[in-house]
Amino acid sequence: MKNDIEFTLKGSVYSIPNSWEGLNTFQFKELVADLISMSAGKLSAGLVRVRHVCRVMGWDINKITDADAMGNIACLAEQVTFPFLICYPDNDAALADLDTDSYELCKRVPPERLTGITISRYLSRLDYKFVVDSCFCKQFIASVHIDGQDEPCLGYTIDTGFSMLTTSLTAQQFIDARELADCRDEQLPLLASILYSSLPYESDKAHQRAVLFSKVDIKTLQANRFNFKGFINYLFSRTEYKILTKIIPGKESVISTGAQYALYGLSADGYGNLREISQMSVLQYLGILRKKMIESVRSLHASKMDVAEIANTTRLPIDVINDIL
């Protein structure tokens, strides 16, 4: 998919972002608000895309009355693919035999607009639906202003420069915030307080300061939640840390514990005292957990345990175990 949609209007070339990372703060917050309205049944996926185009171009959708003009906007909007994935029945069973490129295309482009895909007509007859694709690596809301305070509260940072990922989030801060990633709107001030805390991060102080963030507008608080969830999804689907989410649900495994309990485990293993570990970078923390998981699998294999037994002991899928070995 193209990251930008370019078109010519009255001799000038314009560009519309077609990726989360291409949005600015205003565009991000407004799009998140539209997606929330869509989840409440107030907007369709098509109208969300149309509003995105109008927003970027500075057009007032309520003032567009010409049918041809609206048709042209709708044509542009159909090319906007980044906010959604398309889900087909039975966990995308119809896409099972497609190559990787065709699969990705079918997950983004409605079947009625697919070209060069032999099963597009069949797909168009299926009961497919759009779901929000919240997976990206960018901090859109660098700071939050609270009424009555002179200085804004600075949030966590995300940097992907020079093909390297870094973040200011600490292990404890990430753990606390992740517990609230799907929180109700009433808990949004607490989530914001956690993510916009100064370092060194302290859980109790973040809790105490949460009342201050009740003064922040709801659109910003909701966008902050969406932003953090997008980063979580990115970490655990597009980086080396995705292995940490592969454990199959079931009884407790020898290498799977709660994130908070894992802090105590690392302290017992000599990585530092509890405070030192809780203040370490979340990426360092996840890296250690990943390393311990891989070492555990290899240790079990070295003890002559076969792959099936390792899978039963660790609750990791066999394909993941084979990749490790």
Where are these regions (language model features)?
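An amphipathic, hydrophobic-aromatic interaction surface with interspersed Lys/Arg
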Residues: 1-303, 315-324
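Short alpha-helical "recognition helix" segments of helix-turn-helix
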Residues: 309-312
